[in-house]
Amino acid sequence: MNDLFASTNFGTEKLLEKELLSLGVSDIKIIKGGIYYKSNDLLLYKSLMWSRIASRIYLCIKIFTINNIDDLYDHVYSINWTEIFHIHNTFLVNFKGTNNFIRNSLFGALVTKDAIIDQFQNKYASRPNVNLIEPDIRIKLVLLNNNILHIMLDLSGEPLNKRGYRQFYNTTPIKENLATAIVLSSGWNENTPMIDPMCGSGTFLIEAAMISSDRAPGLKRLKWGFQFWKKYNKNLWKKVLEEAEEKFKIGIKKCFQNYFIGYDYDPEIIKKAKKNASNAGVLKIIQFLTKDVNNLKNVYHKEQEGIILSNPPYGERYQTENKLVGLYVQLGITAKKYFKNWKLSIFSASTFLLDFLQMQSHEKYFFKNGPLNCIQKNFLIFFKNSSITTNEFKDRLNKNFKKLKKWINSEKLESFRVYHADLPNYNIIVDVYDKWVVIQEYQAPKSIDHNKAFKRLCDAIYYTKEVLSISINNIVLKTRIKNKNKTQYKKLFNSNDFITIKEYHAKFLVNLTDYVDTGLFSDKRLVRKLLGVLAKGKDFLNLFSYTGTATVYAGLGHANSTTSVDISNTYIKWSARNMSLNNLTSSQHNFIQYDCLKWIKKTNQKFDLIFINPPTFSNSKKMQQSFDLKRDYLDVMIHLKKILRHDGTIIFSSSTRNFEINFNCIKKMQLHAKKITNKIQSKDHLKNSNIYHSWLIKHIK
């Protein structure tokens, strides 16, 4: 009998146990990450051929206790390696674990290698070579409890998840053995259809089709670790291989065609999935089609039951989570609308995104996918008419969009607002950025029922997609939390993904995910346009310049010079990129990273046109003291007056609710202020006249 160890992914041990028992294996002992078992040579070969769950299968050679380096060398040398592999075979030692005398695993591997080579050298006056890339023989040592060493021979060669069929894949797919574990945990019945609406390289469907057609996972593998083992029984392996081939020939004929359907929005990915399925020999029973989740429908008759199984993107793979909520909302609604009495099984690393399915799971399984802790949730789909005919948010959004559409087209705008907390039950903002939509949710107070608020948010996401004809994949969700610390900006993610938005004759880089704000305020659109008109031949100063959008207009308006000042290095760099995007790169355009309040006190420069759009409050760590607009604006005006030329103009803009400047105080400074809010308020921001304010300020002559 052979003493063996089958390693597996964490969380799949019970599935591996069931699999090995079905093959006839006995004396099983489960540990975390694998199973010890005994078998004869026939069952050994069968477990290698048929295990869909195991990662590798090892022959356990010896377990011993080591107290020093000499013990390690002596115990390894005591094993008769010349009876295990030939001198002409290459080998590799993998050592796992450390203690007080084996400080790193490479040292442990080196001592082991020396002992093996010395044994061959002493017996044959020659030695086998080490191959770090593709060795014939792989020797594994695992150090447990500081001094208990397990030494094993890897009979698999390459990991067993490498079935040989998946030569084409996108990014980092789930390993085949983990995919099988997910399939087996999903509640799938082999006699019912399986649909993967985001199939990628097709792994779930191919593994399920292999199970259904009795196709052994090891059937296509050409090279195995045991083939270089001296005890390799070639005839017995041939028998196992021929038996597996015969089972597949019979099994594939019994399978129903089109019981496996895979969709993906990318035709190139679908081509790869088809090639993989063809390599596995199961393409004839899988249908791959180019289609996104928006267009997912049930193609089977009403009484047919089946399963939707998928591993949607969850932030780690492609995008940040806030870009993916719409995808999960759409998937949940589609499942409930078209797949009555089906099952839904979703594998994800994000419980946050899974909540947007708006479904209650009846089963949960926990797995490790590489370094990620993942969860598989299984749902029973009961009929629910998700196509609500009347919804107040949908009606209001539709009304707003129709009202604005003609104006949007005439102005040729790519960025605009279509909804701003119009309804008490839908306290959100909806902004359009070309083909993208950003939905900003104001965090509901604790007095509001969380489930109701969450349901309304999901409805808003879905109806935004419907009304604006936007791809569900192009909706970004953000939550605006009441800022107790009152810091101005906070980085949320680090995607560094930018899109270009056109506004009249200007272009801007916009980031929809990484910050609370995107880099472009649509409410300041006409202020920017006015600055472009006023800037011709002027020296222009932009204070609290943010991403420099106002500076771009001044530059395009042929300003004599521009100066942008902001305390944030991130936004100064962003400003420079926006200027470069508009071919404004000459030395007349200056960017200064500095505290604006300190800079206006110390500068000796004079300006013809000054734009200031200060925050309501700021207490940046880079500032010596906090800034409060209502408290400090008059002090700021005193210093602005000193740097404003005699015929100069200040455009003072604010987004602070109900803020008004004191005209009498301004007059005492020998300045004249005129409110111009009505002249520069865009049609998509008319409902917020108490928030957006602008004044034109000049010297009294």
Swiss-Prot record:
A Pfam family the protein falls into: THUMP
SUPFAM superfamilies per record: S-adenosyl-L-methionine-dependent methyltransferases
CDD domains on file: AdoMet_MTases (cd02440), THUMP_AdoMetMT (cd11715)
Keywords from the UniProt entry: Cytoplasm, Methyltransferase, RNA-binding, rRNA processing, S-adenosyl-L-methionine, Transferase
Principal EC category: transferase
THUMP domain ranges (all copies): 43-155
Subcellular location: Cytoplasm
Catalysed transformations (reactions): guanosine(2445) in 23S rRNA + S-adenosyl-L-methionine = N(2)-methylguanosine(2445) in 23S rRNA + S-adenosyl-L-homocysteine + H(+); guanosine(2069) in 23S rRNA + S-adenosyl-L-methionine = N(2)-methylguanosine(2069) in 23S rRNA + S-adenosyl-L-homocysteine + H(+)
One of the record's GO cellular component terms: cytoplasm
Disulphide bond pairs: none
GO molecular function: 23S rRNA (guanine(2445)-N(2))-methyltransferase activity; RNA binding; rRNA (guanine-N7-)-methyltransferase activity
Main location: cytoplasm
Keyword Cytoplasm carried by entry: yes
EC assignment: 2.1.1.173, 2.1.1.264
Family from the record: Belongs to the methyltransferase superfamily. RlmKL family.
General function of this protein: Specifically methylates the guanine in position 2445 (m2G2445) and the guanine in position 2069 (m7G2069) of 23S rRNA.
Name the record gives this protein: Ribosomal RNA large subunit methyltransferase K/L
